[in-house]
């Protein structure tokens, strides 16, 4: 009789699981499914990726190294051929590789919150402009947007030029030199972001800047370790088993940013003591402020932000302004070395518009360098600094294609794959700056190219980044040819917080005569 009751109970359980599985992906730890309103199979819009275990896609990344994590998404994109669905550890994930879906998500009012993976960055960046949401994000965005106004960028240009010239001093007296870009470019971009956005020169803090970069790499290593192991997704388990080196690296980078803030406070102290009202009609600092950090310090005086908030934004701006821009420059110089004909076109354009003494190298002159801009845009198409972006549905949300995302669903926008989608790009693996000529852009989907994101959460520093990259390219190409020093076929990409390679990229500089 007991056996009969057990059989009946098991049968009832299996029947219930079968019924429940229509709404939940049971084996993926009761994940609420993505569905269509009329109940038709969701696969007609977005195929479901088969996991390598019975637990959906939960363990698909387990045990993969950095290259394996990166290649997983590339393999999935090729296999599925369109945007697709995964079920991972209690969460539905909508993976986007087409421009239409990207446009819908990046402009959807319900999809402003960053995805859960960004929570792994909270110990580092806390909830600054990159990771915050809701009213806090709106307030910080409104506060910081004026600090990247074109009038402010014009003031930064002299710093970009000076830092670019200082960058070349390390090669003085050398007619030929092979350089490792990952060793020299990040130092340049860190110096630039600290002097422009923070108002602090790193000349006397060079060693501390190097330690910052080293420990940033350690933070990134921990981020990938956590991403690829579901057992470490919970904060408690991560803190118990894998956070020791993470904590020490955090201490170094936070002490560095705190010292930057303290130095700038000292420089502004006299002015703050003497100042009267510095806010505009909206209660925010005047657009005439020189540095972003100045804006934050004055906003603190007016009660609009506290010290922790300043730390959040400084850590965020230093990360985004130093790391993502350095990646653009590294791959930009690599592409110069691999495409000598394109490099020559850039050089001839520079010679036509820019004097050799660089005394008049201002934003107006940079804006004349159209082909150089196309070159850098093509670089960021093939090698976007941020290859994926994430969003979370904080409430049930219907997309334009009919998919209904349950509350808590994750959305991953695969920028790397959208940028190489043959639907939008002819011979997508080929490097062709001419793709960005006006006549070639006008009929292309606007969201087929989103290296700086798009919509209401687009990157406020995209003009800053392009201006900095173009300035260094001008100063360098005036003096050097950039020659090939690596085999591009041997490049192995890694997943990081941003786009990485297994081996450091090198180029050869040959002085022009």
Curated annotation (Swiss-Prot):
Its cofactor is heme. GO terms for cellular component: endoplasmic reticulum membrane. Keywords: Endoplasmic reticulum, Heme, Iron, Membrane, Metal-binding, Microsome, Monooxygenase, Oxidoreductase. GO terms for molecular function: heme binding; iron ion binding; monooxygenase activity; oxidoreductase activity, acting on paired donors, with incorporation or reduction of molecular oxygen. Belongs to the cytochrome P450 family. It is an enzyme of class 1 (oxidoreductase). This is Cytochrome P450 4p1. It comes from the Eukaryota. The keyword Metal-binding applies. SUPFAM superfamilies: Cytochrome P450 (SSF48264). Heme binds at residues 320, 459. The keyword Zinc does not apply. It is a peripheral membrane protein. Its EC number is 1.14.-.-. It is found in: Endoplasmic reticulum membrane; Microsome membrane.
